[in-house]
Amino acid sequence: MSNDALISALSHLVSEGRNPDTMDIDLLTSLEVVEKINQQDKQVPLAIEAELPQIAKAVDKIAQAFQNGGRLIYMGAGTSGRLGVLDASECPPTFGVSDKMVIGLIAGGPEAILKAKEGAEDSLTLGIEDLKAIQFSENDVVVGIAASGRTPYVIGALNYANQLGAVTVALSCNPDSPIAEIAQIAISPVVGPEALTGSTRLKSGTAQKLVLNMLTTASMIRIGKSYQNLMVDVKATNEKLVARAARIVIQATECEKALAVSTLKATDYDVKLSILMILTGLDLELAKAQLDKQNGFLRKAVENNQ
C-alpha cells in the first residue's frame, strides 16, 4: 500500500480520529490530564458489553478446542501482540496448564516484545510462517488482535488459518474492519478516538486486555479449571502461591489450616486433590481416580462422592 493510500485508510479509522474532548489536553494540569484520560477509560467496559455475545461464541470454540487437545494462539503486532503474549504467559501459573496450550505470537518475534521491530507487521507472510513454525492445525483456534483491524501480519495469519479449517477470531477496535470480515467470529469493541490521537495503547489496548482476560478465564472455567470461583488448578511455584494454595483449600472446605497444609503436602500441593480428599474422605489414589473420571471437574467429583 502506498503512503498516500495508507494515510487515507488511517484517516477513516475511528481509533485514529481526534477526540473533541481532549483537544486542549496540552494546556491542562497533571490532575486535569489524568481526569480526562479516566473519563475516556470509562467508555471501555460499555463498548465491551456490546460484544459479550461474540466473546461468548469465541469462548465456546476455545473451550471445545482445549477439550479436543487444541491450542489457543494469539497473534498481533506492537501493543496488540504484547497483550497476547502477556495473557498467554499468565495461563500456566493461574490454571496449571502447559505453556504450549495458550501461545502469544508477536510480529518480529520475542525481540519485539521489548523493542519495536520495524516492518514486521507489514508482512502478509510472516504470520503464516509463525503459525507453521508451531505446527498450527485445524484443531487450534487463532485470535488475531489489531486495534486498527488492518494489520497485514494478522490478516495473512487469519487467511491461512481459514484455509486449514481452524476457528478464527478477530479482535479489533474499529467497526467493519478487514480482520472482522476475514474471521469467523468478530469481536469489535469500538471505544472511540483516544485521548492522545492514535495512541491505541490507551483505550483500545485496555479493551483488548479485558477481552483477552475473558477469553482465557471463561474458557478455562468451561473446562473445569475452577471450583466455585476458586483457582483450584493454581500451581504453587513460590511462597506466595503456596500460601494461596492453602488459603484456597481452607476457603473451599472450611477446614483448619493444619489440615489444609498437611493434605497439600500429601498431594504435592495439588489443590484440587486436596479439596476432594478433605470434602469426601477419599484417599489419594481414589481421589485421583474420581477426578480423572470427571475429566478434572472438581464440583462433579465432590457431588458424586458425598
UniProtKB/Swiss-Prot annotation:
Domain SIS: 62-225
Disulfides per UniProt: none
Transmembrane region(s): none
Highest taxon, organism lineage: Bacteria
Subunit structure: Homodimer.
Family to which the UniProt record says this protein belongs: Belongs to the GCKR-like family. MurNAc-6-P etherase subfamily.
Note: A lyase-type mechanism (elimination/hydration) is suggested for the cleavage of the lactyl ether bond of MurNAc 6-phosphate, with the formation of an alpha,beta-unsaturated aldehyde intermediate with (E)-stereochemistry, followed by the syn addition of water to give product.
Entry protein name: N-acetylmuramic acid 6-phosphate etherase
Organism: Vibrio atlanticus (strain LGP32)
Originating gene: murQ
